[in-house]
Amino acid sequence: ILSNCEGAVELLETLTKKKDPTFLTWLPLSHSYEHTVQFIQIIVGAKVFYAESLEKLISNMGVAKPTIMTAVPRFYQNLFTKINMNFEKQKGLKKKLINQTLELGKKILKKEQLSFSEKILNFLCEKLVRKKIRSQFGGNLQAFVSGGGALDQNIGEFLNAVGLPTLQGYGLTEASPVVSCNLPNLIKVESVGPPFRTNKVKIAKDGEILIKGENVMLGYWNLEEETKNVIKDGWLYTGDIGELDQNNYLKITDRKKDILITPGGDNISPLKIENELVNSEMIDQAIVYGDNKPYLVA
């Protein structure tokens, strides 16, 4: 756990050196993600607020004025829906300005060069749109950190574009739990960022992500056989499929056990389809079924 905290503190240094850090916590304190975050809060000397409830989370942000907040993808999905619904109600010049904010924000996120006129327009977007959105969340937010599941790429792009920096990370309880996280100065929403310096990551021949480091568990309590299945030669076999890009950013593509195989031999990722379905405001949860079946259903 301390090794995990060390890696996280290095990430947070750029976010906490300008202001005294303030966290707003709402995940269960027994959750492995939140459990480790609590130690990190102590290490960086943060002021910690505990949310009253999920329903009051947004209003609590106005009081706490957090600089950093950790949450699971479900929260960001709800946030995306609420902001987007408000955007849809706008008309005329406001609507055009919102569209420009999204377009220019996504270009900046992808490190694309803005023209002189785009820079002027982006300055207006910053003052008239992004600043107002940030003020609704306390006005001091340096970053949202997403973990505990896959964050939809469209949602990540949207939140970053409207002025809410959102860093997606990756981890699992067996690794204490954080393995990697996006960096504030180079956010790749399609990835979960570079591995922490305190652990090693490599990709097996079949694409499985393997982890080694002091953050990896010793084993499952009184489950020797299960431990042998996941820890081999000091490497933790995560069961996740992924790849490392040229910047050493890790991208999760699937769960090894979740791949659906059709009678025709096609390998299909249900996660991608499920994520597309739940983007609809009419769908709360989705599951795709059809392993070894002639067609898929959801």
Please give the residue ranges for each predicted region.
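Conserved AMP-binding/adenylation subdomain of ANL enzymes
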Residues: 2-22, 29-130
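Extended hydrophobic/aromatic segments used for targeting, binding, or gating
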Residues: 12, 19, 153, 160-217
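Gly/Ser/Thr-rich phosphate-binding loop
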Residues: 67-70, 82-187, 284
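Residue-level signal for inorganic ion chemistry
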Residues: 69, 159, 201, 240, ...
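Conserved ATP-binding/catalytic segment of the ANL
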Residues: 195-262
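Conserved loop-to-beta-strand segment in the C-terminal subdomain of adenylate-forming
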Residues: 291-298
